[in-house]
Amino acid sequence: LNLIRRLFSMITVINLTLLIIYKIFKIQILKDVISSMSMIIFLMVFPFWLTGDIFQAYDEMLDSFNIELQNTYLKYVLCFIVDFCIHVIPFILMGFPQNNTSIIIALFIIDIWYFIIYQNVSDIYTPFVNSKLHYSVIFVHICMLFLFIVNSLLFV
């Protein structure tokens, strides 16, 4: 039961759900909000990859699910493949958002997730990821502000 609650509170499961919903909606603004959310989720994971913290996150994740692999190389390759499928492929399939309004709406939705769901269900991720996630949220806000400014300047 705890595992199911953790999984459904994770933003990664939300990202995979968005990929399914994306194909259903015909209204472009909804599709654009969904693609914006997928991009934001990708950007939330990016600092972990950039700093190399992802390896410690992988170790703690496997430990939390009681999965033991003796081969370190195999362990990291399998984790990276799963991580790539969950965070990168949805972003690639949905593409970049087309307007600033959808970016703002998506950022607002992600903020609601962060401040309401994540803050109330504190054991969603491993302790290491929990200690670093607020930096990812700040990073996403900076990236979205930059993207918003660039979009505004390019499409005046």
Task: Annotate the PLM regions.
Residues 25-39, 96-107:
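Interfacial segments of alpha-helical transmembrane regions
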Residues 27, 32-61:
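Transmembrane alpha-helix/helix-exit interface in multi-pass inner-membrane proteins
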Residues 2-7, 75-83, 130:
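Interfacial loop-to-helix transition and helix-capping segments at the boundaries
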Residues 3-6, 119-156:
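Membrane-interface transmembrane-helix boundary segments in multi-pass integral membrane proteins
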Residues 87-105, 115-120, 149, 153:
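Alpha-helical transmembrane segments in multipass membrane proteins, preferentially the mid-helix core
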Residues 47-102:
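Membrane-proximal helix-loop-helix units in multi-pass membrane proteins
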Residues 1-28, 34:
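Early transmembrane hairpin module of multi-pass membrane proteins
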Residues 39-48, 107-120:
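Aromatic-anchored segments of alpha-helical transmembrane domains
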